[in-house]
């Protein structure tokens, strides 16, 4: 089951290793869940519904650490977890290379919080009861809250172990964007102040450090304290997908929260 990571244009698999042809990833399966959610929303096709449910089952049953509920980045064809490597043509591949693959006990805070809100959206579109999925969503949000949020400088880190401080403390634009949506969703679902405080923390960091207000786009990569590392606003792997979506979805959820407290 599941999907391979990298293909050529003729749909033949790329080689393995850094070319990605021998791996399955959380990233691809999460975004296929997102794609099938929208496809099913538009068509109401039973086949699209079935595919969406399959994606949810793969993510929750094969691609998370037990008992933490956090995402595992990469797998072989049989869904055996692998130490994550950086593929040759993905976001961040033009940074200085790392000597080794990431530890197996490593998880990405941005992907976790993003998976939580995309899962909630998928369940809404399927019109299923959210209750059975709440523990999974809460584990993702709680782990990002405990280990991913930088309570000193603001923002959310890149990644770290399941138990312990972050090991990659830079601030990437897309993780900030997904955390805004994810923590607001958690605040709406669980009605806990802690999630609102996480949202405020990340929003303040984004507003004061990451946005180029002159043109409205976000900077790509900052150091932990907000010092600019990459000042470009566009890139092969940096488009307005995360930032525009986060702005729209944040406004939508803030309106929902406002209605709840009236």
For each predicted feature, which ranges?
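Glycan-recognition and catalytic cores of secretory/periplasmic carbohydrate-active enzymes
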Residues: 1-262
């Amino acid at each position: 089951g599941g999907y391979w990571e990298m293909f050529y244009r003729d749909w033949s698999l790329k080689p393995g290793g850094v070319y990605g042809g021998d791996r399955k990833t959380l990233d691809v399966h999460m975004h296929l869940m997102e794609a099938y959610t929208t496809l099913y929303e538009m068509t109401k096709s039973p086949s699209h519904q079935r595919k969406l449910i399959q994606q949810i089952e793969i993510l929750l049953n094969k691609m998370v650490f037990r008992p933490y509920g956090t995402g595992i980045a990469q797998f072989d064809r049989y869904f055996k977890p692998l130490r994550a490597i950086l593929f040759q043509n993905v976001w961040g591949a033009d940074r200085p290379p790392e000597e080794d693959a990431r530890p197996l006990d490593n998880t990405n805070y941005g992907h976790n919080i993003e998976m939580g809100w995309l899962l909630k959206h998928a369940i809404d579109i399927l019109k299923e009861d959210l209750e059975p999925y709440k523990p999974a969503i809460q584990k993702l949000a709680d782990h990002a809250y405990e280990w991913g949020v930088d309570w000193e400088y603001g923002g959310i880190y890149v990644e770290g172990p399941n138990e312990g401080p972050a090991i990659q403390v830079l601030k990437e634009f897309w993780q900030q964007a997904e955390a805004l949506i994810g923590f607001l969703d958690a605040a709406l679902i669980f009605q806990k102040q802690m999630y609102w405080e996480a949202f405020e923390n990340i929003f303040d960091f984004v507003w004061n450090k990451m946005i180029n207000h002159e043109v409205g786009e976000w900077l790509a990569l900052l150091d932990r304290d907000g010092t600019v590392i990459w000042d470009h606003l566009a890139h092969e792997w940096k488009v307005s997908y995360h930032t525009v979506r986060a702005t729209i979805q944040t406004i939508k959820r803030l309106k929902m929260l406002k209605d709840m407290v009236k």
